[in-house]
Amino acid sequence: MSSTFSDSTSEPNAPITPAVDDDTCVAAAPLDFSGASLFFPENFAGSTLRTDAPIGSPQSAAEAAALSDALCAKISPISFGDRVFLLPSESDAWRVAVEMVRRYHRLVGRAKRRRFIVCVGPADATASLPPGFEGDDEIVTLRTDDHAALQAEVDVRTAAILIAPVRTQAGFEVVSGSVLARLRETADEYGLILAFDETFCGLGRSGMLWAHEWTGVTPDLMVARHSPADAPPLAALVVTQRLARGALGGSALAEGDALLAGHALIDALSTPGFQERVQNRSWYLEDQLSALFYRRRAAFTALDGLGLMQALTLAGDAEPMRAKLAAHGLLTRAMGSVLGLFPPLTVEESDIDAAVSCIEMVCAQEER
């Protein structure tokens, strides 16, 4: 499910093992570690993943609504939420979320509460907002995680606090559990809604189904996103029963093909042993990158990550290295000075070995 906290999706590519010699690691086909897809297409379509979704696209609005209700019923038990709303895009999800929060406050007698504080963090100099927030003059961006600064922004007009548990726009940052816990305390103290943007870090990428589960901090509202290569995008707005009081009818229904892909995704994520497999691959990726980092200290200044979201920090701009890796068949993501590696959940150890070998070769070429 791409926000302005993350890059837009692109066509995923099949996994490969690059052929490496002394001068090149050019791959027969790109190996996509850019985060564009949750699954390698052939893995997702294969019989190893259980997909209980009905066959064929729904032919009527009633069929689509039934498919949507069934998917909501699958998502709610595996999340904190009591209610789930499925929308055709992330922009739609955030617009519905904003109106739901504001309407909730009106219903409980706090009509002045309309402002959203978006905690973008100190690394985001441009303070970009999630899609759907454009043109709303009651959105405030906070470029620090200092708790005193946050409390200074809270006033009688504040309705909600929004943060991404893992930030991936201007760089890469796993927001600490202590920061999220303080936001939860502030929201509870002032009667605010705590919203999490899990459009990139949710749905298993962190090694758990939802990234915030690592911290033990539970939001009131969350938006997640799925953008498969062969189906329309799908966004999920997950909320507590208390907040759902502010829901309005008439929201745009997600497309039938998107709902089918959503069923397949949730069924795969719910397959016994699947999340354990993702965690094992996460540890393997982290181990291999840690070894690379210590071998190539001249190239990288830091390594950070959570699950299948790992980031190598360079002394300068990461874009030149991203371009060189792409030329050799490894797709990554440049985020300022950070090179992001976000493989699909179905990544194999051989894919990780191939990616690390490619990075190692490019580093060796640059040191010559």
Regions found by a protein language model. Give the residues of each.
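Conserved N-terminal phosphate-binding loop of PLP-dependent enzymes in the Aspartate aminotransferase
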Residues: 2-368
